[in-house]
Amino acid sequence: MFSKKLEYGYLIMKTLKNTNKYNMMSGRDILTKAKIPTNMGLGILSQLANGGVICSAKGKNGGFYRKSQDINLFHLFYILETNKINVKDYLDIEYQKEMLNIGLLVLEKMKTIKV
């Protein structure tokens, strides 16, 4: 039901669960631990960083870490599947309208899946 991109984004966020700016993971370590192909994984890491849910630091001791622990699957969907740059504030009315439209599309898709 979910795209590989969204599945890999979820695995990356799960792998980064206990990270912070003092305890980062390299991109290689994240992708190895989550068993994600390098080419696709690097692009997803970049999208997640541009989307504001993870941070990256360059250099010898650099790597990636989660910006917040309060991230849900809908945030990932928004960042990875709608090609938007930043997750906006929940109070933003345009964001709420867009999320409603996406939610309705997902519900319509779910109606077509037989179980």
Could you tell me what each predicted segment is?
Residues 1-3, 101:
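Short amphipathic alpha-helical boundary/capping segments
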Residues 4-10, 14-36:
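N-terminal helix-turn-helix DNA-binding core of bacterial DNA-binding proteins
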Residues 27-30, 59-62, 89-95:
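Short linear capping/connector segments at secondary-structure termini
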Residues 51-66:
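Beta-hairpin "wing" of winged helix-turn-helix
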Residues 67-115:
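Non-DNA-binding regulatory cores of transcription-related proteins
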